[in-house]
Curated annotation (Swiss-Prot):
Species of the source: Xenopus laevis (African clawed frog)
Keyword Hydrolase: yes
Upper taxonomic lineage: Eukaryota, Metazoa, Chordata, Craniata, Vertebrata
Function: Catalyzes the dephosphorylation of the nucleoside 5'-monophosphates deoxyadenosine monophosphate (dAMP), deoxycytidine monophosphate (dCMP), deoxyguanosine monophosphate (dGMP) and deoxythymidine monophosphate (dTMP).
EC number of this enzyme: 3.1.3.89
UniProt gene name: hddc2
Superkingdom of this protein's organism: Eukaryota
Cofactors named for this entry: Mn(2+); Co(2+); Mg(2+)
Protein name: 5'-deoxynucleotidase HDDC2
Boundaries of every HD domain copy: 43-145
Chain residues that bind a divalent metal cation 1: 46, 74-75, 140
Amino acid sequence: MAAAGSCSSAGKSLLQFMKLVGQLKRVPRTGWIYRQVEKPESVSDHMYRMAVMAMLTEDRKLNKDRCIRLALVHDMAECIVGDIAPADNIAKEEKHRKEKAAMEHLTQLLPDNLKTEVYDLWEEYEHQFTAEAKFVKELDQCEMILQALEYEELEKRPGRLQDFYNSTAGKFKHPEIVQLVSAIYEERNSAIAENARTSQT
């Protein structure tokens, strides 16, 4: 890195990249806004926990480091295009086009080797052509329903965010994720049943 006091063009570009990525801390997850969740999480909140989940995998057939990198990159384009949700009714092809352009702009700010690495990670996740990308996609959906559970608990309104569970039903295949999803469902179903009992008394 350049010494303090000097300012190279590479340093300026890296600063611009970091500031753009920093926007993810201020981009709320759109699905929660549409459901009137108070203080919805940011995109970076979501990606951070996904990266932790990836770090905790014990599946030796997966490249753990790659899974963590995929988790950290997969929604990076949203610092420019925002979080495009299914309810926005934007075609999948158009969403991909917007996010591709955003990633091309973002990665142009990086040195050539890093530019290729970051962009290729995003493409790998988008096209789902590796076991790691498929695993991280399941983490993405699992983290979402875990967050839905937490919002229901915080609001003391168990069962309110059912549509997030409906949208992910049957999509979990990896044994570790299936185990975590089962624990989420068990805790949620218990809360729903308890709420039904207390509301009848």
